Amino acid sequence: MYKRQYQHRADPNTPAEEVAATIADLMKEGKVQHWGMCEVSAETIHKAHAICPLTAIQSEYHLMHRLVEENGVLDTCRELGIGFVPYSPINRGFLGGCINEYTVFDPNNDNRQTLPRFQPEAMRANTRIVNALQAFGRTRGMTSAQVALGWLLQKAPWIVPIPGTTKLAHLEENLRTLEFSLSPEEWRELEDTVAAIPVVGDRYNAEQQKQVGR
């Protein structure tokens, strides 16, 4: 089976260099064209890229979670010419204003129920951030989801967010983000506003956190 882009999280039991060498072999065999890694550290990116050049790195990145700006991941991608793919750019729907402390998640297929940041008390507190995005967007004709996506899109041309949705209306709303053009000063205003609001709740529980940032 041919894969145009092979992307995965790091195996905690296998050195990055070994994984990269295996991918290089698969490329030589014509089974993989490009590859990337998900939720890895800057150190791991350097190690893997030295063996088999990476095309993309995927990590969670949005206005409520900006760790990749601080831990060297974005700097490493910029330095090595690797694309960066923010997943959950609307924070699993939260920044779109569609869910709140009263939302009941399906226990069978929605892992948000297990995440500390999606517990009722955390969502209640973090609604202040959604309100800030809505206020910012209201004066510019944008929804809060479009504000969240637009903020990412203006960061760099090699940063390409991948919002997921099961609804056509949300897909169309997301695409309309491309119609807006704001100044750097406006985006800095938004960043400053959101940064002044404490984020309540961790992204993952302790066990899940062990699987990221390696």
State the predicted function of each range.
Residues 200:
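Substrate/cofactor-recognition hotspot
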